[in-house]
Swiss-Prot record:
PANTHER family tied to this protein: ZINC PHOSPHODIESTERASE ELAC PROTEIN 1 (PTHR46018:SF2)
Keywords annotated in UniProt: Endonuclease, Hydrolase, Metal-binding, Nuclease, tRNA processing, Zinc
Protein name: Ribonuclease Z
Species per Swiss-Prot/TrEMBL record: Streptococcus agalactiae serotype V (strain ATCC BAA-611 / 2603 V/R)
CDD domains: RNaseZ_ZiPD-like_MBL-fold
Cysteine-cysteine disulfides: none
Pfam families from the UniProt entry: Lactamase_B
Binding site for Zn(2+) 2: D67, H68, D216, H274
Catalyzed reaction equations: Endonucleolytic cleavage of RNA, removing extra 3' nucleotides from tRNA precursor, generating 3' termini of tRNAs. A 3'-hydroxy group is left at the tRNA terminus and a 5'-phosphoryl group is left at the trailer molecule
GO molecular function: 3'-tRNA processing endoribonuclease activity; zinc ion binding
InterPro entries: Metallo-B-lactamas, RibonucZ/Hydroxyglut_hydro, RNase_Z/BN
Length: 309
């Protein structure tokens, strides 16, 4: 499981940072890639990676500002060129209006897609648990921005314990159907009368990962709730230390506010993104160092950077 950042800038493309988009790579878990936001130029950024557009099965949009959605029609069209290899439908989750935006762009440009898009639109009254599969659950909550904006909490369900096959073999259990029964948690009786207790040969379930990905937001308690105990919190850092007033007026956060959210939520790691173009080079280093004074496990990410979870 990895996060790769396709765009880490704020507002408009810059030389060092494209606008917002990241992918959550779940290839080992479910052979899928999930995209979060799709700003202008996202498909160009993908060309610099190993990401296959047809592997992108779900797209989560935080809000309808252009730097988070203007790349979506282009990406969907480019994805169509690979659809003949593997016909794969796509789910798009986002605020009310995302369907109209996408369909209008495709219709007016005469674009035809050889796959279906399933839209899931939300307003403030329909948030909470928005998606569930056998391996993942996704929650959404309203943040505090200048327009309706969501944050997402991706929860991996606990992983089953693994079978200690070597110990089972040493106990005299023949490989075959009995192995399968023990793996499924069933106690078995051997021909010599000994009972094999399944739980003695299966490790404890492994806790699933929690990944919190927030859209643009002022400092808000909703961010804390979404990030409670998260393994990774991705939080915007449009402004730096001392910029709290201007951040609030524009519906954004500073690096220090993001660090405080991570601390209050008891998150394990904080990744800062959505950085204003006025922060470059040493300024970015200082932004990260300042945040570390509040939350030590902080990192300010760069475009195309991959982070393991």
């Amino acid at each position: 499981m990895e996060i790769q950042f396709l765009g880490t800038g704020a507002g408009q493309p810059a030389k060092a940072r494209n606008v917002s988009s990241l992918v959550l790579k779940l290839l080992d878990e479910i052979n899928e890639v999930w995209m979060f936001d799709c700003g202008e130029g996202t498909q160009r950024q993908i060309l610099e990676t190993t990401i296959k557009p047809r592997k992108v099965k779900k797209i989560f949009i935080t809000h309808m500002h252009g730097d988070h959605v203007f790349g979506l029609p282009g990406f969907l069209s480019s994805r169509a060129f690979q659809a003949n290899e593997e016909q794969t439908d796509l789910d798009i989750y986002g605020p009310v209006g995302i369907k109209s935006f996408v369909m209008t762009a495709l219709r007016t440009s005469g674009s035809r897609l050889p796959y279906r898009i399933h839209f899931h639109e939300f307003d403030e009254s329909s948030l909470g648990k928005i998606m569930e599969t056998d391996k993942f659950t996704v929650y959404a909550e309203k943040l505090d921005h200048t327009i309706f904006c969501m944050g997402y909490r991706v929860v991996q369900k606990d992983l089953e314990g693994t079978l200690d096959a070597e110990a089972l073999k040493l106990a005299g259990v023949p490989f075959g159907p009995l192995f399968g029964k023990v793996k499924n948690g069933e106690n078995v009786t051997l021909e010599d009368g000994r009972e094999i207790i399944a739980k003695d040969y299966i490790s404890e379930p492994k806790k699933g990962k929690v990944i919190t990905i927030l859209g643009d937001t002022r400092k808000t308690d909703a961010s804390i709730r979404l990030a409670l105990g998260a393994d990774v919190l991705v939080h915007e850092s449009t402004y730096g230390k001392g910029d709290e007033r201007i951040a609030k007026s524009h519906g954004h956060s500073t690096n220090m506010q993001a660090a405080d959210i991570a601390k209050q939520a008891n998150a394990k790691r904080l990744l800062l993104n959505h950085v204003s173009a006025r922060f470059m080079g040493r300024d970015c280093w200082q932004m990260e160092e300042d945040a570390k004074t509040i939350f030590s496990n902080t990192h300010l990410v760069r475009d195309l950077e991959e982070v393991g979870i």
